[in-house]
Regions:
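Residues on the lipid-exposed face of transmembrane beta-strands in outer-membrane beta-barrel proteins
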Residues: 38-40, 79-83, 134-138, 152-156, ...
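Cleavable N-terminal export/targeting peptides
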Residues: 1-33
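Repeated loop/turn-to-beta-strand initiation elements of outer-membrane beta-barrel proteins
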Residues: 88-91, 144-146, 199-203, 239-242
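Transmembrane beta-barrel architecture of outer membranes
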Residues: 76, 184-190, 202, 223-231, ...
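Short glycine/proline- and aromatic-enriched beta-strand/turn motifs that initiate or cap beta-hairpins
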Residues: 24-98, 270, 276-278
Length: 279
């Protein structure tokens, strides 16, 4: 898996070198047409969820990290691209995948969907969360020192939970496996700012929030999204730089669908280090 990721990253960097080699002008702060970022993200997590069942009723609220032993921290590759459509309008795309797993013997009876796992059951769990934020923003303040923008976008979220247990007391299923899936674009209103300390160094911050109710893929999702971050970048050449960031994100959602009926609360926080390219 990591081999494929790094191969794709190398291909992306090769394309960037080709584009930059044909660029006609040195990019100026706030005037770049494209900015690419690729690096490592090291978040820590706090996740609770509940999966109901039509026959068994309301499921138990479960902490994935504390009760199911799913990894509390993970290192993943994170990439993004910014396209400046015009002087004040820009689009941004971010993508990363969080894939965690764990095995633990539970110390209380837990109902997850159509499964009831008794005390002493050994549960092996896998939780995947893919996040693809797509956002448009407009710079209402823009000069040689500052760029302050606001806009809106979609936080495309794909969530998958799979739990396999060594014992089950469910009266309606002999399967030991419990699953839940959710897939929906969630709206987000965002604002960001960037301050150019000098031509080679800048600092920035961003916030986002929304209270939503959306229907997609045979399900209804409603809840809240909150996000915040801070970053700094240093351009060691006209086209290439390094950066660091800190990101915080929270989503609380109630899901009513054919593949998941229940609740989901998810928080991550962590640093990011990346390489940047611009033209």
């Amino acid at each position: 898996m990591q081999t494929h990721v790094w191969r794709n990253a190398f291909l992306l960097l090769s394309v960037l070198f080709t584009l930059l080699s044909t660029a006609q002008a040195v990019p100026i702060n706030g005037e770049e047409q494209f900015i690419f970022k690729l690096g490592y993200f090291l978040p820590s997590f706090d996740t609770t969820l509940r999966v109901n069942n039509e026959q068994l009723g309301r499921g138990d609220e479960v902490s994935l990290e504390n009760e199911l032993g799913i990894d509390r921290e993970e290192t993943t590759i994170r990439g993004s691209v910014m396209w400046r459509i015009s002087e004040r309008n820009k689009l941004s795309l971010d993508i990363f995948n969080l894939n965690r797993s764990g095995t633990k013997t539970i110390n209380r009876q837990i109902q997850i969907g159509d499964q009831i796992y008794p005390v002493g059951a050994s549960l092996t769990s896998k939780f995947t969360f893919t996040i693809i934020p797509i956002a448009w923003s407009y710079a209402f303040i823009k000069n040689s020192d500052w760029e302050v923008s606001a806009g809106a976008g979609l936080q495309w979220s794909v969530i998958n939970l799979k739990i396999d247990g060594s014992a089950s007391l469910s009266p309606i299923s002999t399967s030991r496996e419990a699953t839940a899936d959710a897939n929906a674009p969630l709206p987000l209103i965002n604002a960001d700012m960037k301050y150019y300390i000098n031509p080679d160094w800048n600092v920035g911050a961003n916030i986002g929030a929304f209270t939503y109710k959306v229907g997609a893929a045979n399900m209804t999702m409603q809840g809240d999204i909150l996000s915040a971050g801070a970053s700094t970048e240093w351009w060691f050449t006209d086209y290439f730089g390094v950066g660091g960031a800190v990101n915080w994100f929270y989503i609380g959602v109630t899901v009513d669908g054919s593949k998941w009926d229940g609740e989901f609360n998810y928080t991550y926080f962590g640093p990011q280090a990346y390489l940047s390219a611009r033209f």
